[in-house]
Amino acid sequence: MHGKNITLSPVLEQLLLHYAGLSSPVNAQSRAVKLLSAQVKTISDEYLAGDSSFKGDLFRSRALRRAYSCYYLPVNLVKLLPVLDELFTHPDIKGFTEPHVSILDLGCGPGTFLLGVLEYLAAHQNLLSPDIQKIDLWGIDQVDENVTTAKKIISRYLAVQKFPSSSTWQLHFRAGSIMTAGFPHPLIPQGTQYDLIIAGNVFTEIDQESFSVLAPILEKLLSPHGTLILIDPGTRASSRRLIQLRDMLLEHTALTLYAPCLERGLCPSLDNPRDWCHQKLSWSPPAIVHVIDRHIGFTKEKGIPYSYFTFRNDGKALIHPTCDFPREKVWRVVSYQIRHKGEERLFVCNGKERKLLRRLTKNISDSNQDFSDALRGDSVAMDGMVRKEAFLDITRDSIFRILKR
């Protein structure tokens, strides 16, 4: 979704403004907006300070909860949209087709990723089969106030957003931790399985021993064709931690890695302590985010970093329907363009190997012209590179083609 104009729907943008006590158009110089901006800065400062006790305090404060929902909720929500795009690119994953659909947001906060799913489905209603009778939305969070807020915002969203009338939406929110008990879990009715589980900014905060216990529980909670998505902020430390959790899930469960890694192996980014695997999302922020950025000097409109892993319970792996190259010829771009006089370079990875590519300006051709447009996160098909000591050289005859973004 690098090249797409990712935005919030007008429905959600207005709901979040209303929840924060604001109206449209946003008055950038109003006392309420200036106060909201200061509260966003407080949230950022406390997170950067690494105070582990602050998260609970943040969501128990109504003022800070409003600031978070108005600013950080959309910033985090949009990270899910390209991940869902990538999931439903698969020709055999046709959306939600069973009569009963269940979706779980672990550590749901004020409803961030459930709202992300709803935003995506509102824009892609072909993914909702006419055979669906009921869609259960589940949110679990340790903070009571989050559960209350999520239920309020999502209920209002469903009341005003247009969805097929044949389906019934039911909301289930629970206050507690998925990590405080075994399986079956007291927060979840026995036998419940989910078609989609999303955990955002949750598991990188727990120790490896706890996650090794939790991993098999996540597997049991997934339906036979279920998807598990882990998302985190995309910092160096959190992304490297997320890779460790990826490896533990692959070790302790039968889940398979769908994306972003194209092959299963030791992540090459761990070889260098300065490296980390992350994406950067381009979007058009809502007006309130623009205004807050101007007040406090943030630049969310320039892009949002994030890291993610998508797992499947049915063995499916990411494929590109329009790609006629064998899988071993498909790689993912994992760096920005490195431009020097007379040449361009970038790194690609397939999950097991990381390669540096170089193309001299004199070697630009029809078969490799996509190289200049490649962005971090793009899947690319490549062939005919010439191995040099420190890189793979792209010749005029080499093929470098960007697949569907």
Across the structure, where does each feature detected by a protein language model lie?
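Conserved beta-strand signature within the Rossmann-like core of class I S-adenosyl-L-methionine
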Residues: 225-232
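C-terminal lobe and adjacent flexible extensions of AdoMet/dcAdoMet transferase-like proteins
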Residues: 291-405
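Class I SAM-dependent methyltransferase Rossmann-like catalytic core
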Residues: 54-91
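S-adenosyl-L-methionine
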Residues: 148-187
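N-terminal auxiliary segments of SAM/dcSAM-dependent transferases
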Residues: 1-54
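Conserved SAM-binding loop of SAM-dependent methyltransferases across substrates and taxa
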Residues: 110-130
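A short glycine-rich, Lys/Arg-flanked "PGG" loop and its adjoining helix->strand segment in the class I
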Residues: 212-224
